[in-house]
Amino acid sequence: MKKVIVLSLGGSLIIPNDVDSKFLKKFRQTILRNTKNHKFIIVCGGGSIARKYISGLKAVGANEYLQSMIGIACTRTNARFVSYFFNKDQEYGIPNTLETLDKYLKKQDVVFCGALEYKPNQTSDSTTAQIAAHFKAPFINLTKVSGLYTKNPKDYKDAKFISEIS
């Protein structure tokens, strides 16, 4: 049985301003080189496009549910894009439940997803943690952020860096 590894691929790595093809090519090579012994679930974040859409909805007073839903849509769009970048077309689409992930993982070595079902205050990183716990798999967080913060440092100037956790 292949070991499952769950990766959170930050949207800022996929599309910092433009698509980062150089990074994505190296990422693809690394993942595909390791499918002999591992299966991967790659959870894609929404990145700056999600933040821009959410900001636009905030500006017109849209509620948090609608803001979350546009963020979820961005994560799923990024997941679809990255799957195509890997030259993979997940024939049943982007999974949106743990049960669907289970089914996909039985058939594929690499599964791409974004956020799953709507939950208040959910992020792609918390989704990745939930998926990793479900599969009893390691969680690797790939991001442009320099470390762990109390809040998103891009959105909150009072975010504090956490240098150590136990």
What label would you give each PLM region?
Residues 13-15, 47-51, 147-150:
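Short, active-site-adjacent cap segments at secondary-structure transitions
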Residues 58, 91-104, 109-110, 119-121, ...:
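Active-site phosphate/oxyanion-binding loops
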Residues 64-70, 115-122:
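A short glycine/serine-rich beta->alpha loop
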Residues 54-75:
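A charged helix-plus-loop insertion that forms the helical arch/lid used to bind
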Residues 73-98:
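Ordered, amphipathic secondary-structure segments that act as subunit-interaction surfaces
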Residues 126-135:
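Acidic, metal-associated active-site segment
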Residues 1-41:
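N-terminal glycine-/serine-/threonine-rich phosphate-binding loop
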Residues 6-10, 44, 112-115, 142-143:
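Short beta-strand segments
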